[in-house]
């Protein structure tokens, strides 16, 4: 990775394309979680990569390149959100299950259940604040460490821990309310 970054610092666009290919999915995912729509997320990701290219000389290598890039994506998205005054994000949880041992009808049933669970999680996350959604996205979906979340968001470690704990509690409460409403509507 260091060699690729050194080449990018020398102006090698092919090396930068390697960095883009390696990080575009995660950058887009984070942007999508923050922006709520595909078009804005694509623009944020593109803007972030342009900023990264223009400022690659500032990357000192103290943290992982991905952490540095996600910080740029995060800040670019927040700037755009402030301009557009968007308030919530849509989070898409993808949980993998091993369905190989099930019959076709069982597989379809499990897919339906998974889709339904995912829908409830998305809806519950939509009820949370942007900060709660960001910390959950970074920790659970992007699998960033607590330290990496600190670097991306400029929050203190204790603050990240508290926010993550509270975000989980709020998510659970939102899910309970949604499911309670769903059960009551069936009765």
Give, region by region, the residue ranges found by the protein language model:
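C-terminal edge and immediately downstream basic/flexible tail or linker adjoining helix-turn-helix-like DNA-binding
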Residues: 3, 7, 89, 120, ...
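Short, charged helix-capping/linker segments at alpha-helix termini
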Residues: 9-18, 28-47, 157, 177-182, ...
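Helix-turn-helix DNA-binding module
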Residues: 123-134, 138-159, 173
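Structural recognition of an alpha-helix C-terminal capping motif at a helix-to-coil junction
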Residues: 29, 43-50, 63-75
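Internal acidic/polar
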Residues: 87-114, 145
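Arg/Lys-rich amphipathic alpha helix in sigma70-family domain 2
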Residues: 57-60, 71-91
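Short helix-capping/turn signature of helix-turn-helix
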Residues: 22-25, 33-34, 137-144
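Sigma70-family region 2
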Residues: 9-10, 36, 49-64, 83-85
């Amino acid at each position: 990775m260091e060699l690729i970054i050194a080449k990018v610092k020398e102006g090698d666009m092919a090396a930068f394309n390697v960095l883009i290919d390696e990080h575009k999915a995660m950058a887009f995912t984070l942007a999508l979680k923050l922006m709520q729509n595909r078009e804005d997320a694509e623009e944020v990701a593109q803007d972030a990569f342009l900023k990264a290219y223009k400022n690659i000389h500032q990357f000192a290598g103290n943290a992982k390149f991905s952490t540095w890039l996600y910080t740029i994506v995060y800040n670019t998205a927040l700037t755009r959100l402030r301009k557009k005054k968007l308030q919530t994000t849509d989070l898409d949880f993808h949980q993998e299950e091993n369905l190989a041992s099930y019959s076709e009808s069982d597989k379809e049933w499990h897919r339906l259940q998974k889709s339904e669970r995912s829908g409830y999680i998305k809806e519950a996350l939509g009820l949370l604040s942007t900060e709660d959604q960001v910390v959950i996205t970074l920790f659970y979906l992007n699998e960033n460490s607590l330290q990496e979340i600190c670097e991306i968001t400029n929050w203190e470690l204790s603050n990240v821990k508290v926010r993550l704990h509270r975000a989980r509690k709020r998510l659970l409460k939102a899910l309970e309310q949604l499911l309670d409403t769903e059960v009551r509507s069936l009765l």
